[in-house]
A protein has these predicted regions:
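Intrinsically disordered, low-complexity boundary segments flanking structured domains
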Residues: 84-88, 169-170, 181, 186, ...
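Active-site region of chymotrypsin-like
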Residues: 92-98, 159-166, 193-265
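Conserved beta-strand elements flanking the ATP-binding pocket of the protein kinase catalytic core
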Residues: 101, 144-146, 216
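Conserved active-site neighborhood of the chymotrypsin/trypsin-like protease fold
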Residues: 105-106, 113-185, 189-192, 209-210
Length: 265
């Protein structure tokens, strides 16, 4: 049995350490290229945009100087998101992925019906005094908790309205090791970040009634409630945590969508 961590709680100090480590790596590679007589790779416009975006975010925390180098592999997940978000299908899926806010914290959720049913994690909305969700294009709405399944960390919210964008839920999906999957969420200080991962295997957590799926993927604080999508764009699971698991290292965890189907029958 293993105890999961509710998301990968990447603190500001840990993030800075990660950036500094990658900065030194990038500078070392640059020096090696110069020694070998090679010209360093020129910065692409999209890389410049990413770097300046990150510098702006951390400027108010006095860390902008850390981003005055030409490449930062530590923000690879932003580069991947930019690449994936250029795809029409990913753009469509992102419209149904929302930011769930309780006033004091935030997470991710996604609409599963055009009349405003939203799935998220129970720990995202637990003890919330107020609830709201923000759709990328339709804006902010008040939400009501209508279903709660704390034993598997799932919750369903209701937003008043209609014609909401929604994701399709897979029916009895199969999981194949090393299969590529996609997920969309609001990690760290960002919103609408698309990323990809690789399916690993199932695991049974301590005090959990159902097995959950592990995936090799960059899951961070704020990704709780993110939908995991297969190649067809159907939701096969809901991210809720990370944990360390040998021999994979830190892995993302998601509740298989069939668990939600069974609970809502």
């Amino acid at each position: 049995m293993h105890k999961p961590t509710i998301e990968e709680d990447l603190t500001e100090e840990e993030f800075i350490e990660l950036v500094l480590a990658e900065q030194q790596k990038a500078l070392a590679e640059d020096r090696q290229q110069r020694i070998q007589g090679k010209k360093p790779k020129k910065q692409r416009p999209i890389v410049k945009w990413i770097i300046w975006s990150m510098a702006f975010v951390l400027f108010f925390n006095t860390f902008a100087l850390l981003f005055q180098i030409y490449t930062i592999p530590a923000i690879e997940f932003l580069k991947v998101s930019t690449r994936l978000s250029a795809q029409e299908d990913i753009q469509l899926y992102k419209k149904a992925v929302v930011e769930v806010s309780t006033g004091s914290s935030k997470g991710t959720g996604f609409a599963i019906s055009h009349d405003g049913l939203v799935v998220t994690n129970d720990h995202v909305v637990d003890n919330a005094q107020t609830l709201s969700v923000v759709f990328p294009e339709k804006g902010i709405f008040e939400a009501e908790l209508v279903e709660s399944y704390p034993e598997v960390d799932l919750a369903v919210l209701q937003v008043q309205g209609d014609d909401f964008p929604a994701l399709e839920l897979a029916q009895n999906p199969s999981f194949t090791k090393n299969e590529r999957v996609y997920f969309i969420g609001n990690p760290l200080a960002f919103t609408g970040i698309a990323n990809e991962g690789i399916l690993l295997e199932t695991t049974l957590l301590e005090d959990w009634p159902e097995t959950v799926m592990m995936m090799q993927a960059p899951v961070y604080k704020g990704n709780s409630g993110s939908p995991v999508l297969d190649e067809k764009g159907q939701v096969i699971g809901i991210i809720f945590a990370t944990m360390k698991k040998e021999p994979y290292g830190r892995v993302g965890l998601f509740v298989p969508i069939q668990v939600l189907h069974n609970l809502r029958q």
